[in-house]
Amino acid sequence: MSRIEKIIAREVLDSRGTPTVEVELWTEFGGYGIAKAPSGASTGENEALELRDGDKARYNGKGVLKAVANVNDKIAPALIGHDVQDQLGLDRVMIKLDGTEFKKKLGANGMLAVSLAAAHAAASELEVPLYRYIGGVQAKRLPVPMLNVINGGEHADSAIDFQEFMIMPVGAPTFKEALRWSSETFQALKSLLHDKGDITAVGDEGGFAPHFSWAYAKQDLASFKAKTPAEIALDLLVEAITKAGYKVGKDGIMIAMDCASSELYFEDKKYHFKKIEKVTGQEWAFTTEEMIAYLEKLVNNYPIISIEDGLSEKDWDGFVQLTEKIGDRVQIVGDDLFTTNPRFIKEGISKDAANSTLIKLNQIGTLSETVEAITMTQKAGWTAVVSHRSGETEDATIADLAVAFNAGQIKTGSMSRSDRIAKYNRLLQIEDQLGEDAIYDGYATFYNLKINK
């Protein structure tokens, strides 16, 4: 047993220049841990609360001094003297101290930073890597990365309503090679955009945020019958993969999408593509049935292996229909739908509303609750995708967690911005440490799809 001796929280900045919480934690026998909380732009309505100050005179109301004070004045006194290796116990102390379902009193940003700092300190004291401390000797599976190379939606000032278009190097033999393939494809995409006269500025997660004016000029803007912005993006990805010299498909690189459809869903229960409407000057909206048909069309025409939040978090029946329609050949990932909350994941499993869960630690607020969410997901035969948020820092904890949980997939941005690259570099270190024991499943990571049986 090693007791927690000191906890200090402070306000620092994330990748958007927005405040977040950093926590340092020390133990009596020299253990030390540090962690920072991430922050999302498009958030599910059932996420744990990210406590902000609301003082418009500081950071436009986005300061986190309240959350910092809660750590220093309330959480720290409650945890000093607690066994740092009792992760479940110390998380329960914070949960009880908060007393609300969605961490509305203390704030999930402060609680998560404490929870992760404690895990880092425990691993430090035992002189083992974090992935080994949490996952034990079985932690040796490197995740297939989902690299967000085209940004849209809330993550970028681009022409695309869907939020993320990602490449997945499923045919690579190792994680190291997977990153090389991805980097070369990213550079090929940049070259293509440049040649077409489009911008190569990047969004919050390091992917490009094109305007597609070159494509709009060639078709009927009023109908988009030729190509929708999503199809233009998908065509570009296929072209970039080929230009980089790789195969398109399971022996090379496949595509994943995050539609972030909760952001498109309005009171009329239709999905409104506001960016298309801005270009055309006309309403562009889908019913649930039309949205499912549109997604199925994309899957039929492009090498798409994963769709996240294809429908709104309020459209549970639609998710069931979508999973029934294409869930045997495509990973249907619930993000806003489940918010890493075991209660909602359990409901999703019972309804067959998806076949995969996105894991975002700050949606639930503690490491032990995250473990519960992943365990529940995997026991159901679903896949788990460990994920960053659009507001990140140099903290690379999720890289260790992806390996610790043998998750098989990680979603942590593109091949630019050091807040994203930090996670990939950490995974390269882990792969090197594991040596011949390192496993990279590639396409086999989609073990629950019929195409792999």
Swiss-Prot record:
Catalyzes the reversible conversion of 2-phosphoglycerate (2-PG) into phosphoenolpyruvate (PEP). It is essential for the degradation of carbohydrates via glycolysis. Coiled coil: none annotated. (2R)-2-phosphoglycerate binds at Q163, K360, R389, S390, K411. It is found in: Cytoplasm; Secreted; Cell surface. Keywords: Cytoplasm, Glycolysis, Lyase, Magnesium, Metal-binding, Secreted. SUPFAM superfamilies: Enolase C-terminal domain-like (SSF51604), Enolase N-terminal domain-like (SSF54826). This is Enolase. One of its GO terms (cellular component) is extracellular region. It catalyses: (2R)-2-phosphoglycerate = phosphoenolpyruvate + H2O. Its main location: cytoplasm. It comes from Mesoplasma florum (strain ATCC 33453 / NBRC 100688 / NCTC 11704 / L1). The active site is at E205, K360. Mg(2+) binds at D258, E308, D335. InterPro entries: Enolase, Enolase-like_C_sf, Enolase-like_N, Enolase_C, Enolase_CS, Enolase_N. Pathway: Carbohydrate degradation; glycolysis; pyruvate from D-glyceraldehyde 3-phosphate: step 4/5. Binds a second Mg(2+) ion via substrate during catalysis. Its cofactor is Mg(2+).
